[in-house]
Amino acid sequence: MTNLICTKYTSILHLLEDLVHHDTSTTTDLIICSTREEFLDEVVTQLDHHHHNSSTSVGRQDEEDAPDLVPAMTTPSSSHALLSPTLFLLSASQRCRLAFCPSITTLRGYLSSYPPGHFITPELKVHCNGHHIMIVNLLRQHHGTTEFTLQGLSHTFASAVSAAHRTRRSLRLVELRGDIASDNHHSDPDQGSGLWQAQVPLLSTSIKIRDDGASWGRRTVSVEKVASRWFRLESG
């Protein structure tokens, strides 16, 4: 099984869209490093952003084509695919199972006992081919804490890899941006895939954390280099 760092996704909507249209023979356990409420709030915020951008685009085009009809126009076409109550979407949702781990301790505990009892099916007991684990925003959860170090990240990475190996599943780590207002998805080093380039100290003990999540006066190493012991960067 493969352990990959996936950098192709920029937002939670981008990720969910891809999972919906994924191969129907695969099942994904999506481990979200936040509370359920925070996750839903982020999804709703991004849907609103998508709707606003789509409505603005449609409105401008309609105004150019038929300015007298603009007040009477509605914008059903701006609705996102994830909001469409189709049988295809319902079927796709059965292939994706969500788990929420709002703290580092919760995440490590969940991974140490993975898979939970209600995830175990007769099919899983026979084989685990076509099953994936995807952990979303692991780095964001660690960033700004005393666990954002080689020692702390190695502990969590090892727990994730152990869970995947134990269940013979492929593993992907995904970092998404929370703020999608900017078109430049790589402009903020403290969000999304930029966190893989962050420098972290070696040990979790006796470090001082600034407001921006950085530390003072310690030997450092890049997060990507720490992860390279277990993971490789997904191509494409």
Show which residues each predicted segment covers.
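N-terminal regions of ATP-driven nucleic-acid and macromolecular assemblies
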Residues: M1-G236
